[in-house]
């Protein structure tokens, strides 16, 4: 549904401005008085309907340049402080950092060493207390060397190779996190919203502006 995202940004300036429309006496004039815009540069990329997660990241390579960038799947709600996440990533100097949370989820989990390096992936059950991948990452441009084509699944060969080479670190998040992969999880989030869930919002702008949605 990329067309909805493109339409939203195409109308962003119009919808966040004070505007007068003058149609008197046959005129057709628009006067913009004030605008209330964020200092953004947004690139919306068509990565292909059937493209796998690694292939989607590969397709944005030309827009990223030579600086680190954030990556998220866009199917979870989290109050992680991305400024602290970025600071942690820049300090350790590895290629990739993923955010890890401890949640009762039936998903693949992480074996994490004492130095926060990810040692292995394995499957878990709902009662397993080990951390899982929360889906918020910081990646160096070198990550593109681990990606092949549209069939590349980021969570398989690329991440496993990063683990083998000691290039994947974990940032432990102890705040709110909830994925939305199915109707049950959607209902859970809507119930929290209805009950007045208040998440901490990050007001301090981060130095990185590029975010990839795989």
Task: Set out the residue ranges of the language-model regions.
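Structural beta-sheet core signal
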Residues: 57, 71, 96-99, 170
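Generic beta-sheet signal
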Residues: 47, 72, 97-100, 121
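Acidic/His-rich active-site region of diverse nucleotide-sugar glycosyltransferases
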Residues: 51-52, 109-123
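Catalytic-core segments of class I nucleotidyltransferases/pyrophosphorylases
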Residues: 68-70, 77, 81-90, 103-105, ...
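Basic phosphate/pyrophosphate-binding loop/patch that engages nucleotide-derived ligands
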Residues: 3-7, 13-14, 64, 68, ...
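Conserved N-terminal catalytic core of the sugar/cofactor nucleotidyltransferase
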Residues: 1-73, 84, 182
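Single conserved hydrophobic/aromatic residue that forms the stacking wall/gate
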Residues: 201-214
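Hydrophobic packing residues within well-ordered alpha-helices of enzyme cores
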Residues: 5-9, 147, 189, 211
């Amino acid at each position: 549904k990329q067309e909805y995202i493109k339409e939203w940004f195409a109308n962003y300036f119009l919808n966040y401005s004070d505007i007068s429309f003058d149609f008197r006496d046959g005129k057709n004039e628009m006067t913009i008085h004030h605008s209330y815009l964020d200092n953004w540069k947004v690139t919306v990329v068509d990565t292909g309907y059937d493209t796998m997660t690694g292939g989607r990241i590969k397709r944005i390579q030309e827009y990223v340049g030579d600086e680190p960038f954030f990556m998220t799947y866009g199917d979870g709600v989290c109050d992680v402080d991305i400024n602290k996440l970025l600071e942690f990533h820049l300090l350790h100097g590895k290629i990739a950092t993923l955010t890890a949370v401890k949640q009762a989820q039936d998903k693949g989990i992480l074996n994490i060493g004492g130095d926060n390096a990810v040692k292995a992936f394995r499957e878990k059950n709902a009662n397993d207390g080990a951390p899982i991948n929360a889906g918020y990452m910081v990646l160096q441009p070198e990550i593109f060397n681990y990606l092949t084509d549209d069939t590349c699944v980021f969570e398989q060969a690329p991440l496993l190779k990063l683990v083998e080479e000691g290039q994947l670190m974990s940032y432990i998040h102890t705040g709110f996190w909830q994925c939305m992969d199915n109707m049950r999880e959607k209902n859970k989030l809507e119930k929290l919203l209805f009950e007045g869930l208040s998440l901490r919002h990050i007001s301090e702008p981060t130095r990185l502006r590029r975010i990839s949605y795989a």
